[in-house]
Amino acid sequence: MTFLLFQLLVLLRYSIGFHCKIDNNGVKSVTSKKNDDEKIVISRNWKAAISLDFIFIVFPMLLFFTVLSEWVYHGTGLLSLLVLILSVTAKRSFSGLQRGQSLSFRASVSSYRVALMLITCLCILAVDFTIFPRRYAKTETYGTSLMDLGVGSFVLANAVVSRQARDVSSGNWITGIKATAPLLLLGFIRLVTTSGVDYQVHVTEYGVHWNFFFTLAAISILTSFVNIPAKYCGLLGFAVLAGYQTWLLSGLNTYLLSDERGTDIISKNKEGVYSILGYWGMYLLGVHLGYRLFYGKHTNIRSTTSSIARVFLVSLLLWIVTILFDNYVERISRRTCNMPYVTWVLAQDLQALGIFMLSSYIPLNKLSSLEEAIDQNLLATFLLANLVTGMVNLTVDTIFASPFSSLLILTAYAFALSAIIGTIHFSGFRLKFW
């Protein structure tokens, strides 16, 4: 529902016009919607475009995550109707979707990844305030929520568009290890900074020392050592998950979900260490699905309709498998990253990706200025969000903040994040760490 809501807000935003992008020559250009979508090149107007993106995309998302959370279904229905009306009106100016006019698969994936990043950035701070519904927060043992999708969705989003999924050589394992160094560095920086300022860490999430960056680094290292063709990744991924799930049912899940911790490093970080197997299996399945659905030689990437149909069909099958696993094998658990959790993330994310691909049929659909900025600086956006979140938590007693103060702080945070990333991008910089 949240991905659909995001896409509807993007479509509504684009119907208003006035967009800024950087062309191949590094020149800023703004498209203002006038008559036949006349393109006007104007310098320094990206600030207005980013501001409109914030007003029509980011701020409404923030409201639906907090004070309007009970109205999310009503809001989605209303936005769907409004976008439908605007789409019908827009089609009068088009003789039909011409080849190359609709969003490509790559653009659809970019929009999906940006939505995931934006939702994550909003939630990691909002969850600390009382106006954020607890049903959206991460579960402690079993169950599902919006925030439970986070790390799994990041792993899958990287897998689907990885070099391995595209059947492109990624070099030897030494190259892979070097590429992992920045993730390890970020993981240690987060560990040192959180320990240095005595920042509150939920130990049951990853463990005492482990964090999200270490999980990504571990997956990258394993993939570098076991580098097999994409068409075989599905089989290996299933084998890894089946073995891990069997281990969980043999008693490992009881240990991982208990408060028992020894003095050794693995025991102190048992959730993060053991769940690597689940996330690696998920990554391998994501590589295989990306190859089979989008990049394989047998796949006609130009056939948007068939690609969308395949995505929704696989998503439906995964939903069925998830229900069966959840009822007859083990309940979904993000904390252990068991097989039901993996199939749940796959089903959710493929469904969301299908929605973004389906929106390519709507004439209004384009990447917004803010989407473009975040897409080119995904990791920088996440790091900035974590930094600001930490600063807010160290200076504000979020639990006792009033609803008005909470919304004001979250709005300022969201706007600052949008403005800074927009400034970085439209000033010609691109923050890459490897």
UniProtKB/Swiss-Prot annotation:
It is found in: Membrane. It is a multi-pass membrane protein. GO terms for cellular component: membrane. Its main location: membrane. GO terms for biological process: GPI anchor biosynthetic process. The chain crosses the membrane at residues 48-68, 70-90, 112-132, 141-161, 173-193, 206-226, 232-252, 271-291, 305-325, 344-364, 380-400, 404-424. The keyword Membrane applies. Residues 1-17 form the signal peptide. The keyword Chloroplast does not apply. Keywords: Membrane, Signal, Transmembrane, Transmembrane helix. This is Uncharacterized protein At4g17910. It comes from Arabidopsis thaliana (Mouse-ear cress).
